[in-house]
Swiss-Prot record:
Residues in Pentraxin (PTX) domain copies: 24-225
InterPro entries on file: ConA-like_dom_sf, Pentaxin_CS, Pentraxin-related, Pentraxin_domain
Summary of the tissues where the protein is detected: Found in plasma.
GO MF term set: calcium ion binding; complement component C1q complex binding; identical protein binding; low-density lipoprotein particle binding; low-density lipoprotein particle receptor binding
Gene symbol of the encoding locus: CRP
Cellular localisation: Secreted
Signal peptide as annotated in the record: 1-19
The keyword Secreted belongs to this UniProt entry's keyword annotation: yes
Name of the protein: C-reactive protein
PANTHER family, A to Z: C-REACTIVE PROTEIN, C-REACTIVE PROTEIN-RELATED
Length: 225
């Protein structure tokens, strides 16, 4: 019994696991550059994705300093199945199935930023919305399907399934309002989400989030309306 208790305490000291938590008006805070602080999210996926939409808020001072990972979705087959990344020189980088597409940033923000990205296999069309404003549509990985059995991580870029983190690509700041759908939201629906709605996310829901924190990650009240 003593050995079992010790094993349990060791596991809980390494990470904190929470299931189905309502994260409304809260945010994950990554206070410093590391290669071991991140949040892993558990998604509800039963079949490969032929489309998706991911929306979230970020707040950071790193825009003019260096690149960093915003959202990293990896499978054992492909480390960058879905990637949302910021590059100081190229702007937002969206990736599907290991192929990346840059989107020029409309401006360098000094306040919290709301980001939505969507993609569909049938056309390959990939979209980026920044603070409710659509950027020029582009095409990427037409006919591709995003794999299941995924590791979804906030705060670090996965160069292998669930690992190979680089502190120079880590996120420093706040991430919140993370929602994901297995279909492409319409412009009207994107606007609803930007205005504070959720529109029933069915892959990841910020109002019922199953997550695990690792390293120095804190949960605090959000700093945006």
């Amino acid at each position: 019994m003593a050995k079992l208790l010790l094993y349990f305490l060791l596991l809980t000291s390494l990470s904190d696991v929470f299931g189905g938590t309502d994260m409304s008006k809260k945010t994950f805070v990554f206070p410093k550059e590391t290669d071991n602080s991140y949040v892993s999210l558990k998604a509800q996926l039963k079949k490969p994705l032929s489309a998706f939409t991911v929306c979230l808020h970020i707040y950071t001072e790193l825009f003019m300093t260096r690149g960093y990972s915003i959202f990293s979705y990896a499978t054992e087959k492909e480390a960058n199945e879905i990637l949302i990344f910021w590059s100081k020189d190229r702007g937002y980088i969206l990736g599907v199935g290991g192929i990346e597409m840059p989107f020029k940033a409309p401006e360098i923000p000094s306040a919290p930023v709301h980001i939505c990205t969507s993609w569909e296999s049938v056309s390959g069309i990939i979209e980026l919305w920044v603070d409710g404003k659509a950027q020029v549509r582009k095409s990427l990985q037409k006919g591709y399907f995003v794999g299941t059995e995924a590791m979804i991580i906030l705060g670090q870029d996965q160069d292998s399934f669930g690992g190979s983190f680089d502190a120079n690509q880590s996120f420093v700041g706040d991430i919140g309002d993370v929602n994901m759908w297995d279909f492409v939201l319409s412009p009207k629906e994107i606007d609803m989400v930007y205005s504070g709605g959720t529109f029933s996310p069915n892959v990841l829901s910020w109002r019922s989030l199953t997550y695990e924190t690792h390293g120095e990650v804190f949960i605090k009240p959000q700093l945006w309306p």
